Amino acid sequence: MANKKKDHREEAVELLKQDAKRILQLIKVQMDNLTLPQCPAYEEVLDTQMYGLSREINFATRLGLIEPEEGKNLISALEKELSTLHELSMSKK
């Protein structure tokens, strides 16, 4: 049973990482092709996506699939990547 829980845990972490990567990719496309970071539509998409990911992480934490600290680290890493992307975008314009 412990091995099965470990498999679910690893799968949950991998799915959350994939979702974080998808958010980053979505924001990259939006910044490259559609809108500026100051645009309300950009901010709305980013806020919605980040909120959704935080709810997924909360759900996985409540199920015991990930540790709270691991979820915080995932959000923090994504926020850092998005901040770097934002800075690069602003320096190009």
Swiss-Prot record:
Pfam family, one: DUF1507
Coiled-coil annotated spans: none
InterPro entries recorded: UPF0358 (IPR009983), UPF0358_sf (IPR036270)
Similarity comment: family membership: Belongs to the UPF0358 family.
Full protein name: UPF0358 protein lwe1048
